[in-house]
């Protein structure tokens, strides 16, 4: 629905990998101090969420990546629920500030420049529409995706590389797709090479689920509640409402097939298969007997040994038993792609007013 003059708060994770002092200064130039909230701990984040909700904001933009978004929207949801009907869930969105920005791609977030942040903040206040989306619910938290196995290792290894390269000459080369590729080749693959894959059992714990083929159509019979979806070796077993992790890494090509289902991907690929098919895997175009895809709304996952886990791209230790579900209530997401392209704010707008072509702006 269209909205006029939203009251927008910006809630930033000051500890996120992509949120440096420079980024914080940039955000503070765009957002006035009374609407900017910076958290440095879980407890401080909860306190700021309570303050934001009590101040009557109807929209909250988070800054700090997918993990930050998951953390803050969970705190917002819990605070609203604790109010026993006295509070209302605001519309939520993201500013592209963190290292993991899959959600930013879905919502059309601009790059974290003065122009981009000014544009997105203005759009959130005046012209952007919202879209409904139900997220993954796991361990009481909301997230766009979560899982165990290889994806958790890749995300953790990518974060490690980003941290180690920050402030060095390698930093520009270890960001984005190149950073992911380096993490996979230099860190993740050596860790899993030669290791026996654990046996994982996945049970349907909700509405009828089904397997899908490469075309996204159902394959085989419906799997009812209590029945086994999968039992076998696992390199990765993850669910998602987004089609990937950002940087066009489309690990979940069927995430948008049904709004009332999660895409569950289970893979038992060996290292050689991953390395020789990485381009197709990255694009979401590779399918084989070692990759099994399902559409589900609630599952139970049990592993014979603990596996590395990620929730929203943040490492969460190891788990051998997990329940995943499609959240009951949808979020109202601020979709910047629906807003006007040219806005009367920001450096480019100022240049237009002076009669200067945007491409001739000084650096």
Predicted regions and their residues:
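Catalytic core of DAGKc-family lipid kinases
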Residues: 9-11, 19-21, 39, 78, ...
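Short glycine-rich anion-binding loops that position phosphate/pyrophosphate groups of nucleotides
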Residues: 65-68, 74, 97-100, 148-151, ...
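ATP/nucleoside-binding phosphotransfer catalytic cores, i.e., glycine-rich phosphate-binding loops
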Residues: 10, 224-231, 247-363
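Glycine-rich phosphate/pyrophosphate-binding beta-alpha loops
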Residues: 147, 151, 238-253, 315
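ATP/NTP phosphate-donor binding region
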Residues: 1-63, 68-79, 84-86, 117-119, ...
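Short glycine/proline-enriched coil/turn segments at helix->beta-strand junctions
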Residues: 29-35, 54-56, 139-140, 305, ...
């Amino acid at each position: 629905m269209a909205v006029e003059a939203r009251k927008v708060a910006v809630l930033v994770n000051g500890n996120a990998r992509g949120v440096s002092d420079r980024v914080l200064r940039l955000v503070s130039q765009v957002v006035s101090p009374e609407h900017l909230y910076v958290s440095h701990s879980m407890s401080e984040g909860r306190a700021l969420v309570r303050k934001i909700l009590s101040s009557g904001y109807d929209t909250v933009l988070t800054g700090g990546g997918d993990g930050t978004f998951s953390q803050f929207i969970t705190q917002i949801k819990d605070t609203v629920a604790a109010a026993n009907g006295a509070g209302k869930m605001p519309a939520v969105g993201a500013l592209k500030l963190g290292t993991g920005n899959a959600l930013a791609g879905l919502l059309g977030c601009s790059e974290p420049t003065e122009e981009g942040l000014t544009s997105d903040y203005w759009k959130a206040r005046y012209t952007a529409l919202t879209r409904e989306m139900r997220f993954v619910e796991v361990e009481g938290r909301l997230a766009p995706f979560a899982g165990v196995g290889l994806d958790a290792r890749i995300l953790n290894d990518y974060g490690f590389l980003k941290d180690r390269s920050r402030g060095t000459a390698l930093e520009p080369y270890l960001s984005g797709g190149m950073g992911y590729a380096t993490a996979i080749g230099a860190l993740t693959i050596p860790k899993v090479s030669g290791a026996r894959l654990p046996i994982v059992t996945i049970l349907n714990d909700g509405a009828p689920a089904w397997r899908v083929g490469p075309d996204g159509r159902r394959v085989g019979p419906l799997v009812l509640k209590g029945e086994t979806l999968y039992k076998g070796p696992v390199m990765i077993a993850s669910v998602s409402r987004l089609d990937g992790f950002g940087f066009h890494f489309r690990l979940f090509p069927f995430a948008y097939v049904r709004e009332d289902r999660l895409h569950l991907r289970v893979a038992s690929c060996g290292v050689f298969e991953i390395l020789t098919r990485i381009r197709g895997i990255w694009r979401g175009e590779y399918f084989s007997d070692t990759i099994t895809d399902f559409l589900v709304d609630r599952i139970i996952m049990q592993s014979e040994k603990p596996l590395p886990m990620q929730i929203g791209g943040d490492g969460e230790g190891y788990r051998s038993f997990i329940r995943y579900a499609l959240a009951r209530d949808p979020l109202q997401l601020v979709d910047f792609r629906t807003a006007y392209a040219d806005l009367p704010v920001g450096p480019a707008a100022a240049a237009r007013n002076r009669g200067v072509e945007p491409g001739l702006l000084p650096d």
